[in-house]
Each structure stands twice: as C-alpha cells, then as structure tokens.
Regions:
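Short, non-transmembrane amphipathic alpha-helical segments
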Residues: 77-96, 100
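A short, local hydrophobic-aromatic micro-motif
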Residues: 36-39, 52, 101, 108
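A short interface-forming secondary-structure element
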Residues: 65-82
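Terminal low-complexity, intrinsically disordered regions
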Residues: 1-34, 38-47
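A domain-level signal for the structural core that forms small-molecule/cofactor-binding pockets
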Residues: 2, 24, 58, 112-116
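Short, well-ordered secondary-structure micro-motifs
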Residues: 30, 78, 115-116
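Short, highly charged C-terminal tails/helix-capping segments
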Residues: 102-116
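Short edge beta-strands and adjacent turn/loop segments
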Residues: 39-70
Length: 116
C-alpha cells in the first residue's frame, strides 16, 4: 500500500487499487454520522482546501483518520467516541480493504438538536 497524490494505493497480484482519500473520508464520515449521539461533523479545512469533518493520512501503510464531530447534549462523550471509532474502522476496512491504524476523535462542539 502506498500514497499517490490524494489516493491510497494497494498493490494486488492482479494490479493496483487506487482509492481517493476523499472516498475514505466519506465512508468514515457516514459511519460516524450513523451513530446515535452524533449531531454532525465540523467543517475543517484539509491541506487540499476541502471542507469536511474528516482528515485522512497514511502512516506505515495504514490509514489514520481524524474525525471532527459535534456530540448531542446528554450523551457520554467517551462512549460515543468509542462507538464512532469502532464503526469507522469496520466501515473503512470492509468497504476499502485498507487497514486502519487509528481513528482520532476530536469533539469540537455540543448540539442541543438531534442532527446538526
């Protein structure tokens, strides 16, 4: 597995698979948003200038995902964060075949609405 201009590459016997970092971010963000207690993702600017609540990097041929979330008031942040981490790892690994090294959760806000 390697990195090439915004894509994560996995070399297989039959050829290479290139998946955009934006795809990994989208999968991770969707998995996080499905967790009860998550109101939404914060808008952060990535190095490429795209606003999204997920940053993707590669360390030791494994994906590292940073998610910037807004938690609904009344939910235990540590429990929600762990649920998000597990959901993101499961979704990214099953949909892309790439290993996830870490999912770092950054809670940047609390919402009183169900979804932000």
């Amino acid at each position: 597995m390697g990195e090439n201009k915004g894509y994560i590459t996995h070399v297989e016997e039959l050829g290479s698979i290139h998946i955009s970092e934006d795809v990994l971010a989208s999968v991770a963000g969707t998995a996080a948003y499905e967790i009860e207690g998550i109101s939404g993702l914060m808008h952060v600017t990535s190095k490429k200038g795209h606003a999204r609540g997920v940053r993707v990097s590669v360390e030791s041929d494994r994906a590292v995902l940073d998610l910037f979330v807004i938690v609904r008031y009344g939910f235990a942040i540590p429990e929600i964060a762990e649920k998000v981490q597990n959901a993101v790892i499961s979704a990214v690994e099953s949909m892309t075949g790439f290993s996830v090294k870490a999912v770092n959760i950054h809670v940047g806000g609390v919402s009183f609405n169900e979804k932000f």
